[in-house]
């Protein structure tokens, strides 16, 4: 008997605690975590600096709403803007889908403020941007739409790495192009440097906002603080969440100064967004991730080479956001790995996705590879 709605196809295990890169079930069995709560636990589990900061904040102040000044928001926003390509402003939300919704609203508001009727968006096939109506409409996967139609009007889907398909969808009412530079849920599909360069040119040429969904790729996951930095892009807006709080729910959008000005009092908001606890968590995560970036690149390259050596499929991704595309469905392998104490994820049917904590070491990767070699 359960009192929970049947939303999730849960695996047959109950975790009761975590430490570092490991989770432990009710029986005390140890599991090597290469999922990180779907890219959330950037610093692993029970990371001492994060744990201590949260304990201190809980005893001080949890929530005040956005009716008042919030120094914790200011501190975290400054740290996020510091890594942006230009001066910008931050709006805080609670999740990835809320961040994408905020980006959509901001883009429409920006063009309305400029007196232009630009309200449409182009996103990409196999993309995933969230499950609330705006972000769901931006998601280029019909399986997520089924049963929830009609969707929000104005969204169309181009093919990743096919610039002609983007041109075909563009018109004078296009407000923004929304893209993940590496699609996560869609199968760890990377946009090419040439394609992204041309996409940037289109946005500039056609007066369209470039919105990058960094919910999964951001905050050090790919070896750069923001994944767009691999490609020398200059986005107008980026959406953040997942790894930013290290396990505490938080989302954010970061927009360049001119675009950000379109959010004015009453235009958009959030009761919980940017509460002191979440922002305190985010501040610790950002400080630690800044120091971890060279490590993420090093162990990410090591992991990628080890996956290639398996010779079992196409290896995709960057840093510690990697995928192994198999020739058959991968759901069974997730269960086999679970039995052997390794947590991995199957996405897009045939892609094993790996999102370990950013603190992972080479010996952990060796252990994971050993399990993969055995089960594959």
UniProtKB/Swiss-Prot annotation:
Localization per Swiss-Prot or TrEMBL: Cytoplasm
Sites bearing N6-(pyridoxal phosphate)lysine, chain numbering: 242
Entry annotated with the keyword Cytoplasm: yes
EC class (word): transferase
GO molecular function (one): N2-acetyl-L-ornithine:2-oxoglutarate 5-aminotransferase activity
Catalytic activity field: N(2)-acetyl-L-ornithine + 2-oxoglutarate = N-acetyl-L-glutamate 5-semialdehyde + L-glutamate
Pathway assigned in UniProt: Amino-acid biosynthesis; L-arginine biosynthesis; N(2)-acetyl-L-ornithine from L-glutamate: step 4/4
Cofactor requirement: pyridoxal 5'-phosphate
Family statement: Belongs to the class-III pyridoxal-phosphate-dependent aminotransferase family. ArgD subfamily.
Cofactor-binding details, from the entry: Binds 1 pyridoxal phosphate per subunit.
Assembly behavior: Homodimer.
Gene: argD
Protein name: Acetylornithine aminotransferase
UniProt binding sites for N(2)-acetyl-L-ornithine: 131, 270
A single GO BP: L-arginine biosynthetic process
HAMAP family: ArgD_aminotrans_3
GO cellular component: cytoplasm
Family matches, as Pfam families: Aminotran_3
Organism name: Aquifex aeolicus (strain VF5)
Main location, first listed in the record: cytoplasm
More details: May also have succinyldiaminopimelate aminotransferase activity, thus carrying out the corresponding step in lysine biosynthesis.
Residues that coordinate or bind pyridoxal 5'-phosphate: 96-97, 128, 213-216, 271
Lineage: superkingdom: Bacteria
């Amino acid at each position: 008997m359960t009192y929970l709605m049947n939303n999730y196809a849960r695996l047959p295990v109950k975790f009761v605690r975590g430490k570092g890169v490991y989770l432990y079930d009710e029986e005390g069995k140890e599991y090597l975590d290469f999922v990180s709560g779907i890219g959330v636990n950037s610093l692993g589990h029970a990371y001492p600096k994060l744990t201590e900061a949260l304990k201190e904040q809980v005893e001080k102040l949890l929530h005040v709403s956005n009716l008042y000044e919030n120094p914790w928001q200011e501190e975290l926003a400054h740290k996020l803007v510091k890594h942006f390509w230009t001066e910008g402003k931050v709006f805080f939300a609670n999740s990835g889908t809320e961040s994408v919704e905020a980006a959509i609203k901001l883009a429409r508001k920006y063009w309305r403020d400029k007196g232009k009727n630009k309200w449409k968006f182009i996103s990409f096939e196999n993309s995933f941007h969230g499950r609330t109506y705006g972000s769901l409409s931006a998601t280029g996967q019909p399986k997520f739409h089924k049963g929830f139609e009609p969707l929000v009007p104005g969204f169309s889907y181009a093919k990743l790495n096919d610039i002609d398909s983007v041109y075909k969808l563009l018109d004078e009412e296009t407000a923004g192009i929304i893209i993940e530079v590496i699609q996560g849920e869609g199968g760890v599909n990377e946009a090419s440097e040439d394609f992204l360069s041309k996409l940037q040119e289109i946005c500039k040429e056609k007066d369209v906002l470039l919105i990058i969904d960094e919910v999964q790729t951001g905050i050090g996951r790919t070896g750069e603080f923001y994944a767009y930095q691999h490609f020398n892009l200059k986005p107008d807006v980026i959406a953040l969440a997942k790894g930013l709080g290290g396990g505490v729910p938080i989302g954010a959008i970061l927009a360049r100064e001119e675009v950000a000005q379109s959010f004015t009092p009453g235009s958009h908001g959030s009761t919980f967004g940017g509460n002191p606890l979440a922002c305190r968590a985010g501040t610790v995560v950002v400080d630690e991730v800044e120091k971890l970036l060279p490590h993420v690149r090093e162990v990410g390259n090591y992991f990628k080479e080890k996956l290639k050596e398996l010779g079992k499929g196409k290896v995709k991704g960057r840093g510690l956001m990697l995928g192994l595309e198999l020739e058959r469905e991968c759901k069974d392998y997730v269960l086999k790995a679970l039995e052997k104490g390794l947590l991995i994820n199957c996405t897009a049917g045939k892609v094993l996705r790996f999102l370990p904590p950013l603190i992972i070491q080479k010996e952990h990767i060796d252990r994971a590879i050993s399990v993969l070699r055995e089960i594959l």
